Curated annotation (Swiss-Prot):
Keywords: Disulfide bond, Glycoprotein, Secreted, Signal. The keyword DNA-binding does not apply. Disulfide bonds join C45-C67, C49-C69, C60-C80. One of its GO terms (molecular function) is C-X-C chemokine binding. Transmembrane segments: none annotated. The keyword Disulfide bond applies. This is Evasin P1166. Glycans are attached at N48. It comes from the Eukaryota. Residues 89-110 are annotated as: Disordered. It is found in: Secreted. One of its GO terms (cellular component) is extracellular region. It comes from Ixodes ricinus. Residues 1-24 form the signal peptide.
Length: 110
């Protein structure tokens, strides 16, 4: 009986801690050097790459040539992934007048 109660308390503690961490989120300073202004995306290209007997890897096709083979050392099979890095600190913050000007206008009916 004690083991069941102890296990239940551990599970409740892990759930509470997990919820707290999700709600708290990462702490970042929103300045231009912060990670908040950087975005690194990785997409799976839908294929794998394999090590050939001549030591080269099979080509990764797809996504208009942006796919590359990523593999762990010593492995003979890797994943074809497309990566992209965007640094939003290079772009100015839009003003509300710019946002209003870019908003779609309602259709005029005659």
């Amino acid at each position: 009986m004690e083991v069941k109660i102890f296990t239940l308390l551990q599970i409740a503690l892990f759930i509470a801690l997990g919820i707290h961490l999700v709600v708290a989120g990462p702490e970042t300073k929103e300045d231009k050097k912060s990670d908040v202004y950087e975005l690194f995306t990785v997409e799976y290209c839908g294929t794998n790459c394999t090590l050939l007997t001549n030591g080269r890897w099979t080509a990764c096709t797809g996504k208009k040539g942006t796919c590359r083979c990523y593999h762990e050392s010593g492995e003979k099979v890797g994943l074809c992934l497309s990566t992209e890095y965007t640094d939003f600190s290079e772009y100015p913050n839009p003003k509300s007048s710019e946002i209003d000007a870019a908003a779609p206008l309602p259709r005029e009916t005659h």
